[in-house]
């Protein structure tokens, strides 16, 4: 019997998707513009009704950077679904949805600090679940090196939303000030998406 779910799987397998590069500059500009004052075109998932707005905000940044929404297959990411607005659901999405010519959606991978660049994401996973997501908007360096300050950075600057509009909205904030341990930090390299 053909169901809507089966039809989505068939369509996903039969379709060849084209790669679209991530516009890091556009994503970063969006993050910096809306870090302190949320975009009124989207709901704010803060106190007292929700646990936080971090992943809703980083999803908006990805979308502003040209990442296409994905409503095909088991793992999906589109405006205001659970993966769009929830840190752990977003982790499950990008970690399981391996964007490729036959899989629609985000192409992202785990990375290491030295390879993180503008508009990549960083997630906090203290135990069994991701609890927070931020976007990289800058760097701190001791030396400029070989025309690649990202390579010689000792810290990155981040933008974030949280559950509290007064204290949780950060713009160009040093990641080191958050004091996350190495074990609980996941660096997410964003390559682009397949559409």
Where is each model-derived feature located?
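Active-site scaffold segments
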Residues: 55-64, 133-137, 157-160
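Short, solvent-exposed loop/turn and secondary-structure capping segments
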Residues: 70-74, 136-137, 171-172
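Intrinsically disordered, low-complexity coil segments
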Residues: 40, 46-51, 140-154, 172-181
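Short loop/turn segments at secondary-structure transitions that flank enzyme active sites
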Residues: 64, 68, 140, 164
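N-terminal capping segments
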Residues: 3-83
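Low-complexity, Gly/Ser/Thr/Pro-rich intrinsically disordered linker/tail segments
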Residues: 152-165, 170-195
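Low-complexity, intrinsically disordered terminal/linker segments enriched in charged
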Residues: 1-3, 176-177
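...with weaker cross-activation on analogous glycine-rich loops/strands in unrelated enzymes
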Residues: 78-158
């Amino acid at each position: 019997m053909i169901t809507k779910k089966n039809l989505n799987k068939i369509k996903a397998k039969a379709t060849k998707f084209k790669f679209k590069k991530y516009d890091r500059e556009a994503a970063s500009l969006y993050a910096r513009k809306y870090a302190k004052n949320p975009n009124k075109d989207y709901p704010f998932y803060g106190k007292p009704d929700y646990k936080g707005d971090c992943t809703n905000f980083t999803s908006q940044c990805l979308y502003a950077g040209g990442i296409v929404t994905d409503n095909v297959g088991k793992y999906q990411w589109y405006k205001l679904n659970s993966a769009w607005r929830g840190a752990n659901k977003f982790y499950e999405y990008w970690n399981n949805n391996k964007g490729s010519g036959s899989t629609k959606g985000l192409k992202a991978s785990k990375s290491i600090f030295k390879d993180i660049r503008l508009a990549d994401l960083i997630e906090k996973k203290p135990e069994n679940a991701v609890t927070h997501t931020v976007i990289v908007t800058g760097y701190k360096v001791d030396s400029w090196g070989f025309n690649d300050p990202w390579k010689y950075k000792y810290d990155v600057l981040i933008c974030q939303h949280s559950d509290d509009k007064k204290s949780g909205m950060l713009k160009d904030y040093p990641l080191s000030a958050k004091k996350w341990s190495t074990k609980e930090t996941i660096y997410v390299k964003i390559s682009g998406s397949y559409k």
